[in-house]
Design a protein with these regions (language model features):
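Extended recognition/assembly regions associated with phosphoester-bond processing machinery
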Residues: 1-81, 85-285
Length: 285
């Protein structure tokens, strides 16, 4: 996905072709690889009640798709970068076994599984298998890469990482409509090469420097979760914080899931982020 940034890069960020998943490949041969996905949104659109086979966006279908990517890449770990479930307030009783079952199926592939809490993940922790590693909204660092959801300020440790990976934005790109696809909407990756100088809004807000030279925003894993057509519309207020503050002072480009470079993106002014304490983990590492 484009040329790498200058300087030493200990971990390769490799988008999985034709899939909304990012593979972290450390240079060290003994280091495990991690597959990063975001915005799974289990329970979206009434998919719990629909009859028949697993519908698009259902937990079973999403688990099948994620397991297929795990087997295809041979990864040793899976990290969900926020919004594992869709309901924002709590976890409805009907959704609780679905959440547990989804993560249990991924764990059954003998991979380490983690979740960085997103704004939709309030109340999810008691309904996860105990083997799932849970990280707060401030994010975590894997092999030098800072990973967070994007709705709240990352921790200072994450901010100091050389590269950042986030979700939350549901990035998309609108192509010319066709008879087969009248809307022309596509999920996409956003990749930014930033200037090394830290962004001023971060210095004022957190007294911390954003040292990342490369930022990657992953597309929503759930295909029915909707997209922000970044080449046509300004992101919704709840998502523009990430797009404005963290992607500023750099060059942003969009790539379709098949790797097609569809060009540069405008970066609008950001809105205020949520507090980092808005979503907290009951346990984590």
């Amino acid at each position: 996905m484009g040329r790498p940034v200058a300087g030493p890069v200990p971990t390769r960020l490799a988008p999985v072709p034709d899939a909304p998943a990012l593979l972290l490949e450390p240079d060290r041969r003994d280091a495990p690889r991690t597959l990063v996905v975001a915005d799974v949104h289990l329970g979206l659109g009434g998919t719990l009640e629909r009859p028949g086979g697993p519908p698009e966006g259902s937990a079973d279908r999403l688990a099948d798709q994620l397991i297929a990517i795990v087997k295809r890449t041979g990864t040793e770990g899976v990290l969900v970068a926020g919004d594992a479930k869709h309901p924002i307030v709590g976890t409805p009783p009907a959704l609780r076994p679905v959440v547990f079952g989804f993560f249990a199926r991924i764990l059954s592939e003998d991979v380490r599984v983690g979740l960085v809490l997103g704004n939709h993940d309030v109340g999810i922790v008691p309904h996860l298998p105990r083997e799932v590693d849970v990280y707060p909204a401030g994010g975590t660092v894997r092999d030098g890469v800072g990973i967070f959801h994007g709705h709240a300020w990352p921790s200072n440790r994450v901010l100091r990482a050389d590269r950042l990976v986030a979700g939350h934005l549901h990035p998309g790109f609108r192509l010319a409509p066709t008879a087969a696809d009248p809307e022309g909407k596509r999920r996409c990756w956003v990749r930014v090469e930033r200037e090394p100088e830290p962004a001023r809004p971060l210095r004022r807000r957190r007294h911390a420097e954003l040292g990342a030279r490369e930022i990657v925003v992953v597309p929503a894993f759930n295909p029915i979760a909707g997209t922000e057509s970044l080449n046509r519309n300004r992101p919704a207020r709840g998502r523009s914080f990430l797009y404005g503050r963290f992607l500023s002072r750099g060059v942003a480009r969009a790539y379709l899931l098949d790797g097609t470079d569809v060009g540069p993106l405008p970066i609008p002014k950001a809105s205020a982020p949520a507090s980092r304490g808005a979503t907290r983990a009951r346990r984590g590492r």
